[in-house]
Amino acid sequence: MSFRSVFLALVIAFALILAAFLLNRARPKIETEQPTADLVRASGKCAECHARTQYSVVHEYEMSAHARKGINCLECHQPAPGQEKKDHHGFVISTKLTAGNCRGCHDGIYQQFLRSRHAAPAWAAIYGEKGLSPEQVNFSETYQPGGTRRPPHPFVQLEGGSAMTSGCEKCHSVGKPNPDGTIGNCTDCHTRHTSSVRIARLPSTCAQCHMGPDHSQIEIYEESKHGIIFQAQAHLLNLDAPPKTLTTRDMFVPTCATCHMSGINGVGITHDPSERLSYYLANAITEKRPNYAAAQAKMKQVCSQCHTPALIDRVYSQAEQVVQATNDRVRSAQDLMNGLRKDGVLNSPPFSQPIDFVYFDLWHYDGRTSKHGAFMGGADFVQWHGNYPMLQKTVELRSMAAELRRQHGKAK
């Protein structure tokens, strides 16, 4: 064999080896990093196709804890009982995943979620009992009295279906009843395919819904010292830390999840964000929750990971004073409105007269904001976004009420 033939054979062999190497590197990581044949069959085949049509799905999955633990696509997309089945390139899957798919591995977390206001009460705040079974309503009422057994909100009829579907539902569907008998969708907080605790711990995740004039928690958080320090030091936090071993070394600055859900330094994990709340701050007149003492003790235990008992007690005492003062203002406005109805001055449907909107804004916007600001360290929201506009609307209500009475010949 001539030198030229040997050289040509070596070049061809090298080219083939290089091509094989480059082709292998181009394959999705999930095909090359997972060891079992079943995993390659399920996830590898899915990734091979979806990498061409929906690369972001494959990329997000590659970064997930599910991928690291060897959980394949089929294990999540396997139809749960009661779900619609679809034949998809040789696999029987469900494309409309719900909490029913997640509960197969995370049933304890799902049960905690069911007890929360994120579950059925979130949906019922818009649509009442629509779509919920009697058993689901009864279960929810056990833990959240009055949260589910209620009529649809007046805005459903007044604003129409499109406003609900593209507006309110985008947040309140976290508690939507599913055809498979489950409630909710875990991806509202954890996102699809990434299924990330990092994303769930970010304030911006909660801010998808907890923002705006009627529930301005993210705006209050960003003004607070907690929010300011988070913005400065977020890059130093271990947002990927395993939930069961989370400590203040990982999260030395709290996010929403740290205070309301995380287990930290031995404090128990919960997927019921109301478990540590001692008041119904969203209500017009705020009352203590049935588990007031236990809930407050749990939240104070979280606070104590960074703060002294004296400071914690002082903050709670001051916040409770704001709650009582806000209740007094709202109750005065309620009495005014009830008096108008009793005297036949105000007998039209809800939200049909300007005074209805002024009263609603007083408690639903300003009252809530004042109370949340007091508990979350947002001074400006207690005053200029809370008490000041409440005072302004109180004067406006009295003026409007007097004019209505004059028009009806029932002036006082």
What residues fall within each predicted segment?
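Short sequence/structural segments immediately N-terminal
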Residues: 2-412
